[in-house]
């Protein structure tokens, strides 16, 4: 009766997780996203655990969610997963007012960002 299910956007050997409305500027979030691109998930998790950036905690949660999606929803082997994509997008920007001297005002921008992580299963072929 209802609509047919939409075809899967990702290939069968990939899984995705999205973290929306992270309270950090996209530039700062991209610094941490660059850190994990192309790495095996075990190495990426270790890098995020020891990163001193505040947002690394949220990126780690998103990566763990992508790993769980791969394991539980798509039956992929966790040991063979690699971070295929980790990209950042802009979300909304809250605008605030800061009173300054002589009756002036300054605008404070509080940006938000979205993070998408795609993991792919890469099987090691026997050579």
UniProtKB/Swiss-Prot annotation:
BP-aspect Gene Ontology terms: translation
GO cellular component: cytosolic large ribosomal subunit
Gene3D superfamilies, alphabetized: Ribosomal protein L22/L17
Family per record: Belongs to the universal ribosomal protein uL22 family.
NCBIfam families: rplV_bact
Species the sequence originates in: Methylobacterium sp. (strain 4-46)
Keywords linked to the UniProt accession: Ribonucleoprotein, Ribosomal protein, RNA-binding, rRNA-binding
Protein name per Swiss-Prot or TrEMBL: Large ribosomal subunit protein uL22
Role description: This protein binds specifically to 23S rRNA; its binding is stimulated by other ribosomal proteins, e.g. L4, L17, and L20. It is important during the early stages of 50S assembly. It makes multiple contacts with different domains of the 23S rRNA in the assembled 50S subunit and ribosome.
UniProt GO molecular function: rRNA binding; structural constituent of ribosome
């Amino acid at each position: 009766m209802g609509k047919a299910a939409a075809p899967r956007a990702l290939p069968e050997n990939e899984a995705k997780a999205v973290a929306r409305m992270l309270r950090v500027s996209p530039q700062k979030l991209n610094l941490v996203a660059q850190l994990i691109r192309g790495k095996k998930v075990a190495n990426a998790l270790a890098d995020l655990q020891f990163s001193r950036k505040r947002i690394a905690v949220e990126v780690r949660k998103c990566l763990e969610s992508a790993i769980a999606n791969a394991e539980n929803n798509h039956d992929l082997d966790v040991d063979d997963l690699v971070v295929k994509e980790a990209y950042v997008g802009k979300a909304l920007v809250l605008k605030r007012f800061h009173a300054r001297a002589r009756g002036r005002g300054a605008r404070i921008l509080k940006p938000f960002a979205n993070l998408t992580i795609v993991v792919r299963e890469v099987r090691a072929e026997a050579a």
